[in-house]
Swiss-Prot record:
PANTHER family (alphabetical): D-ALANINE--D-ALANINE LIGASE, D-ALANINE--D-ALANINE LIGASE B
Top-level taxon: Bacteria
Name listed for the protein in its UniProt record: D-alanine--D-alanine ligase
Localization terms from the record: Cytoplasm
Gene from which this protein is expressed: ddl
GO biological process: cell wall organization; peptidoglycan biosynthetic process; regulation of cell shape
NCBIfam families registered for this protein in UniProt: D_ala_D_alaTIGR, PRK01372.1
UniProt main location, coarse: cytoplasm
């Protein structure tokens, strides 16, 4: 019998981010094989508990994106099954995927975030929830799925029509936020360290799903060419958010920075507990800036999960125990 550690790479699933998850998972699996692990790739389905029991992994590498791999569901299952796994636990995952709940925890801790409102989809047919321009997005999705900027040019300033609702047809409740002009920044955190700041410059002016995952659609500038005090603040806020939410392993914090407002123009948009691991992904890119290649990064994530007591859910910072 092999003495290699057995890593199950969990990927796919049925969320809107399935294809990206499959791509992440395949790259991770190949890297972990190069790192010397025995690797099994598992496509998430309704029989996943049975498949995990049969596989008998030493640890699961969670390469899922969206529900149920990013919202605490699969984390809770693996907790019940006493299976070690990478990335954040149940509580941090469930909070971070809910953008409005995340605000309620981070804003009182002096982490600036755009303050919007929850809106029922049907109400959009009669009036705008906020003055234009504003951003409309699902409450519980990642990868910029369903995110749109509603400005004066949208429908000639008139309310959204029913035939324009397709991006949000599967979401009864949406989040509306004031649009923050300026630049798109992102920071990866690994463990207790913020890695770097990347500026994202989409060719079409908006960092949507297509811009994120289509080669050549977005220019990544890493490290970002921004004032040192902005980079320091973004990295400090990212690490603080990671710790307050109780994240472990890698996370990624996304920001908008109004460069005309200086330090006061930096706003955290969301914390992603399952950042992508594709060739275009930001965590591997920032790790590379620090001299950590892709194989080494995947090994670090696995070894952290094996070393920590991930069999008991990570508690949120500030709680006892």
């Amino acid at each position: 019998m092999s003495d290699k550690k057995h890593v199950v790479v969990l990927m796919g699933g049925w969320s809107s981010e399935r294809e990206i998850s499959l791509l992440s998972g395949r790259h991770v699996g190949k890297a972990l094989e190069e790192a010397g692990y025995r690797v099994t790739l598992l496509d998430m389905d309704r029989d996943i508990a049975f498949k995990l029991r049969e596989a008998k992994p030493d640890v699961v590498f969670n390469a899922l994106h969206g529900t149920p791999g990013e919202d605490g569901s699969i984390q809770g299952l693996m907790d019940l099954m006493a299976i070690r796994y990478t990335h954040s636990g149940l509580t941090a995952s469930a909070i971070a995927i809910d953008k409005e709940l995340t605000k309620k925890i981070l804003t009182p801790e002096n982490i600036p975030m755009p303050q919007g409102c929850l809106v029922e989809r049907e109400s959009l047919y009669t009036k705008d929830p906020l003055p234009r321009p504003y951003v409309l997005k699902p409450v519980n999705e990642g990868s910029s799925v369903g995110v749109a900027i509603i400005d004066e040019s949208f429908n000639d300033g008139q309310p959204i029509r029913k035939d324009q609702i397709d991006p949000w047809k599967n979401f009864k409740t949406l989040l509306a936020e004031p649009f923050i002009k300026g630049r798109e920044l992102t920071v990866a955190v690994m463990g207790d360290k913020a890695l770097a700041v990347t500026e994202l410059c989409p060719n079409n002016g908006f960092y949507d799903y297509k811009a994120k995952y289509t080669d050549g659609m977005t220019t990544h500038i890493c490290p970002a060419k921004i004032p040192a005090e902005i980079a320091e603040k973004a990295m400090a806020l990212s690490l603080k958010a990671h710790q307050l939410l109780g994240c472990r392993g890698p996370s990624r914090s996304d920001f908008r920075w109004d460069d005309e407002a200086g330090l006061d123009g930096l706003f955290l948009l969301e914390v992603n507990t399952q950042p992508g691991m594709t060739p275009l992904s930001l965590v591997p890119e920032q790790a590379k800036q620090l001299g950590i290649d892709y194989v080494a990064l995947c090994r670090m994530i696995v070894e952290e999960a094996l070393a920590e007591d991930t069999l008991q859910e990570t508690k949120m910072a500030g709680q006892g125990g």
